[in-house]
Amino acid sequence: MFGDRQRPMVLVLGLGESGLAIARWCARHGCRLRIADTRETPPNLAALTAAGIDAEFVGGAFSPALIDGGIELVALSPGLSPLAEDLAPLVAAARERGIPVWGELEFFAQALTTLGANGYAPKVIAITGTNGKTTTTSLAGLLCERAGKTVAVAGNISPAMLDKLTEAIDAAALPDVWVLELSSFQLDTAHTFAPDAATILNITQDHLDWHGGFAAYAAAKGRIFGPRTVRVLNRDDAEVMKFAPPAAAADAPRAITFGLNEPAADGDYGLLRENGIAWLVEAVDRDAADAPATPSRRRKQEAANPPDIALKRLMPADALRIRGLHNAANALAAYALARAIDLPAAPLLHGLREYRGEPHRVEVIATLDGVDYVDDSKGTNVGATVAALDGLAQRAVLIAGGDGKGQDFEPLAAPVARWCRAVMLIGRDAPALREALADTGVPLADHATLESAVRAAGALAQPGDAVLLSPACASLDMFRNYAHRADVFRSAVEDIALEKGTTL
């Protein structure tokens, strides 16, 4: 369970959901534990005690002294940046002493390796990206279920991977398929993780403060791929396509692409627009033999004789219940992942039609006097808001602002100029947003509260428009979390509905 170490003494840094899961897992397998948190009484300390875990707890600032006294393994919670001023010296000291630094994902990967020695061989699907992870993960899990597999969905989406694995072991019900949503934080401390199929949906600026820069952030995303992982890549994203294997490499892993244009290579996915209808399609080689070639042989064959590609219609895009072109891309990614582990197409297509989406992700909560009120409170970065505006493809009054996390807001200018009737600015970084959008020609208005912004947006919107809450920012400057921000938005829309003599 712990590589070449038997019941090591483990230092767990951070007692959030993931840290608590690691502590439970290590205690279950006989490890001695020291747990440290910068908070003197973290909320999960009571849960640790209730679980009967015998651990030394140290509250307060981190220091290298925490690894003294026989620590053999350091477990790092995903919320803690290894670059943080109080943590970097500790991590450096651990590495100097040859002490491994793992995150929960590495513990999970090591556990699967151990279970594999006893015959457990599940398929593992992994999803990362700046935006769309939760939607694609939930959808991929549903598709695998519709194909008749037992499925466990875990990771960044919650529950923690180790908690889900413990539950499955205790129930003697290990799943056929694991579908994991993984953040850059979780991937940063993974070393041996090697899923069967994985996707990077997109890479745009986010968490730059945590990683120290965009290059490090993108590199962390790339750690999702093992040596033989089928790579499902967004061909519309140049940063993602940097992870495409070299075409000439004989031992390169298989790669599949998806995008919002017509696919041109056998096995890729995309959109075909024909007679006013957008279709989800798969590119197929008309001349392909019945017996599939290996990826390396297929590349050699295609280099010598370019395939004659036909586009196989899968379903109309408007048959999806999730709105927006970005969600069509998410659907293609989920379908490609399921097909990459050899699941049959027919039940997957039924699942695509069935999926209703996740809350706070371009969710239409009301239509009042012809105006859609759209909750995209989970849109906590610039890329998410760009995707929401382009995906809805309708005139909108945008509500944006909050804690910008050091992002560059300039990429918002073009979609705002194209789609927005006006922008309501809220939160701490409203001035930075105003500066980035100043030359768009779109009216900008500052509001002290979200309620005020919603009311003003509703007054400006015309029938056929959307009032879109897609802040491009984190919420903690004004709200408890993004769900609280969404609740305030919904409440404000409910007030407008009541004034119009209706309810949501």
UniProtKB/Swiss-Prot annotation:
EC code(s) of this entry: 6.3.2.9
Major location (coarse): cytoplasm
GO molecular function: ATP binding; UDP-N-acetylmuramoylalanine-D-glutamate ligase activity
Enzyme kind, highest EC tier: ligase
Pathway: Cell wall biogenesis; peptidoglycan biosynthesis
PANTHER family linked: UDP-N-ACETYLMURAMOYLALANINE--D-GLUTAMATE LIGASE
Family stated for the protein in its record: Belongs to the MurCDEF family.
Protein name: UDP-N-acetylmuramoylalanine--D-glutamate ligase
